[in-house]
Amino acid sequence: MMKKLLLATLVGMVLILGACGNQDTAGKDKKEITVGFGVGTYEEQFRNGIVPILEKEGYKVDIKSFSQNMQVNPAMKEGSIDASIFQSTAYMEGINAEIKSDMTGIAYVPGAPQGIYSVNHTTLDDVKDGTTVAVPNDPVNQERAVRIMEELGWVKVKVDAGTTDFNLNSVESDKYDIKIKVLDPAQILVSLQDVDYGVVNGNYIANANRKITEALKIENTPLEHRIIVSINKANENTQWAKDLKAAYESKAFEDYINAQEKYDGFILPDAWKNN
């Protein structure tokens, strides 16, 4: 009787371990992935340049679009998307701390730098006391915008200013008494008529079929502010994540981007230097 009981227990353990192993393998080798996007041009890059590469490798790709960028990372945390393309490393790290997520970046994508745009002025030389400048309302992109203004001598930024917790209390007047207007990043481009200048994230420029090179000033985007492919760190060693990274770093995707005039002025991944 004891031998039969022991045998049944061992068989049960083998079946359970086998099932767990199969689930782990399925997770690593799955061929269906869901990728999330916020507002901007990165979905079009992915749909036309990356999906064909992944489909040739046998993947079925579902694209999930969000009307607001703030909706993307909670979806990643809960597992309703496998990857996202819309944010920088600095932004991601701030969100990791805020919502207790554990995301990581696996590749850089062709990204649009911030720039200063205007419909009321054709030169930055028109700046004076009282000039109004619109900047993004999220800390990371706001810090980027203010750094451009600092480079121009329009404002000063305190030495102890942060990045993910940046706010306008860290900004002081320099040559001019600038009036800073805080707006949702997606609203700045369509609100340019209401301000003298606006610092616009480049993906909104490209999405509006305009050129980055129209900017009166383009930022030299630091590495931590360049757009990445984000995934949950637990999936870092899965085959699908490796294939997604390889697709973004491939010669085929490089050729696609270089053939599209709308991406003139974009910051290209350093990995392409190896193609």
Please place each PLM-identified region on the residue numbering:
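A bilobed periplasmic-binding-protein/Venus flytrap-type ligand-binding module shared by bacterial periplasmic
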Residues: 113-125, 225-238
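A conserved helix-loop-strand patch within extracytoplasmic ligand-binding domains
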Residues: 106-154, 254
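Short helix-initiation/N-cap motifs at beta->coil->alpha
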Residues: 63-74, 161-190
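Short, well-ordered beta-strand elements
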Residues: 27-40, 59-65, 132-133
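C-terminal motif of bacterial Sec signal peptides marking the signal peptidase cleavage site
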Residues: 15-19
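Ligand-binding clefts/hinges and TM-proximal coupling segments of bilobed small-molecule sensing domains
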Residues: 139-165, 245-275
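Short, polar/charged alpha-helical segment
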Residues: 40-62
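Ligand-binding "clamshell"
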Residues: 94-106, 119-122, 194, 199, ...
